[in-house]
Amino acid sequence: MVTRRILLGIATLAAFLPPASAPAQPIQVVMWDEQQPSQKQAYSNFLGNEIAGYLASRPGLAVRAVTLDDAGQGLGSDVLDNCQVLIYWDHARHHEVKRDKAREIVRRIKSGQIAMISLHSAHWSLPFIEAMAEVTRTRTTQRYASADQQVEINFVQGQDFVGPKRDSQITPRVAARKFPDGRTALKVYLPNCAFPGWREDGKPSYLTTLLPNHPIARDIPARFTLPATEMYDEPFHIPRPDEVVFEERWTGGEWFRSGCVWQLGRGRVFYFRPGHETFPVYKEKIPLKIIENAVRWLAAPR
């Protein structure tokens, strides 16, 4: 029989114990997918839903899948207000996304409200283009803010969705003109966010983990192979990444910076290259694990 004295002792002990901590809130993840019909060749329920389903099965993640055809293009305030990490896939309908939607995403990244993961062909998504343009503007402004001489900066946006040729000058780039009165005029050509070579042949690619201690590379092999991918070839017209986590190569000699991170204000952007929507890349364990790692790292308090 439990005596009154024992019960009082338990109550007294409990009074000195720290209160139980509230359970950690799950990371709010939004998977945005254009859902082009050709995805059905590899994903019976679309690529975005494949990724969302995997992430939803992992502890500590709350996942919402949205599409371009949803209300507000799947990017309304009701979605973004409840998002910590936005994963973005598009390919054939880049131009249908409203630019003000892309700029709102960038504003939220800069403020630290959200982070973004752009996958494969989303190198030409408007949110990624706008994010890379803003990285370029920020770096350029910071570099010349303390210059003794007067510097005038003109940012030049190229034509959307027109890829560079092999001999095109790499963007972003700066053309400077100095005047006798001490002024310097800079013309800054914003990044094209594309590359001169690609091949949709479904051949293997060979990836190397360049930063094995990076949180995105946690539990990822030093080297691994994807059995069927689309090839992208450098040079990738992007601002210099703050970190390159993975490099990808093909037997034809092509190579690509396939896992790039940029700091943008108080937020971050991660670009992960492997794809094509007709190849089951995102049924492979390693790419899914990389996305999960990226979600957890991008959402971590800084």
Spell out what each predicted region is.
Residues 12-14:
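Alpha-helical assembly-interface signal, strongest on the long, hydrophobic N-terminal helix that forms
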Residues 4-8:
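N-terminal export leaders
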Residues 25-27, 67, 109, 238-243, ...:
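Extracellular ligand-binding/catalytic regions of CAZymes and related secreted enzymes
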Residues 31, 36, 40-134:
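Helical hinge/lid and interdomain linker segments adjacent to catalytic or ligand-binding clefts
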Residues 52, 106, 217, 292-295:
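Non-transmembrane alpha-helical segments in soluble domains
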Residues 56, 62-64, 82, 158-265:
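Catalytic beta-strand/loop cores that center a nucleophilic Ser/Cys/Thr
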Residues 16-21:
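C-terminal segment of classical bacterial N-terminal signal peptides
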Residues 93-213:
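A glycine-rich, often tryptophan-bearing local segment used as a flexible ligand/cofactor-contacting loop or short
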